[in-house]
Amino acid sequence: MQTQNAPETAENQQTDSELGRHLLTARGFHWIYGTSGDPYALTLRAESDDPALLTRRIREAGTPLWQSTTGAWVTGRHGVAAEALADPRLALRHADLPGPQRHVFSDAWSNPQLCHIIPLDRAFLHASDADHTRWARSASAVLGSAGGAPAEGVREHAGRVHREAADRTGDSFDLMADYSRPVATEAAAELLGVPAAQRERFAATCLALGVALDAALCPQPLAVTRRLTEAVEDVRALVGDLVEARRTQPGDDLLSAVLHAGSSAASAGQDALAVGVLTAVVGVEVTAGLINNTLESLLTRPVQWARLGENPELAAGAVEEALRFAPPVRLESRIAAEDLTLGGQDLPAGAQVVVHVGAANRDPEAFLAPDHFDLDRPAGQGQLSLSGPHTALFGAFARLQAETAVRTLRERRPVLAPAGAVLRRMRSPVLGAVLRFPLTTSA
């Protein structure tokens, strides 16, 4: 696998004027549809509207599955959401669109498609279920599988990185900038075996990739979109070089594991590239988000934070409850591969189905006192976070990092407390991404 110049992707072929017009048109439709009060369209605006109110409105709509003015079929009910996420007929891409998942607004008023704002195929975000299943199987020895834990080496590295990060914090620090993102990025770099000389480049690339999951559904500013597409090509080149090196010098890293799990050299190399790219695109952001959301849920409830000091074993339950209460990925979008019936509605092939995971995870029909963050909530109640194909790949890894963060900060910074409000990124309906969360270690 030789590193090559970035190919002419759909975005690279467009002038700034063309791409900017495309993004503004999609953004305009979200605003127009939102004027009717459509809660999903307002969610996609991701501006100043109350996300908790919109989440409740999506869940409490008149029917379990309803059609938004955007054209998408939306559900916030737990039963329908679980059914949709488990249905193999609902895929990440259009069955009749074999190339990049991109829709041009040539006659947008007739039937605008807002399911793939920009194509992210080169980031492997629109791959098939079969591909994701194969990648998960080949990566499981290192990343862990559903219900399983990551490799012991991954656990040992997590403990060391989190201790070092906690010890670097002063009397006040920002959770995202000074802790969550650095440890998530460093953990991902270690997974891939990124050389020390390349880690600064890797961190900068991951930062630009952080908007990817949001950009699929919510148009980002032109400059941000350009940086994203450039970062995708940069991480492909970086990971491609690592994969080539592992062919002759394998190690105990994730890429080596995937290479040696493949049935052929060609397919194994492509699988390793995909898993490596997804680690940077999805793994880092989901992990950083889960760390932030778990600690925010605990630190804004001092009694719960104090309980962790008395019983550190509650850390795993705190992470699982945070996945339900404040999921790091709020929206999951799918495309019907064939005509099907879901939630009492007949959907044609090509229809977009959106699961609002945050709404479904607070469905009172599935959870007792769903708006209460409960460290003692029984496990196995069916929270739906990290059940998408690419997010599930990093489920065990993200849980490990978040649990380690909780344990480490509770031990080393026991009087940790918020020093201001959480500031979230605009245009982040999928992740609800945190920009800043100031903390103080002084009583």
UniProtKB/Swiss-Prot annotation:
A GO molecular-function descriptor: monooxygenase activity
Classification via CDD domains: AknT-like
Record's keyword terms, sorted: Antibiotic biosynthesis
GO biological process: antibiotic biosynthetic process
Function: Involved in the biosynthesis of the anthracycline antitumor agent aclacinomycin A. AknT is required for the glycosylation of aklavinone aglycone by AknS to yield aclacinomycin T (rhodosaminyl-aklavinone).
Family the entry assigns: Belongs to the cytochrome P450 family.
Protein known as: Protein AknT
Annotated organism of origin: Streptomyces galilaeus
Gene encoding the protein: AknT
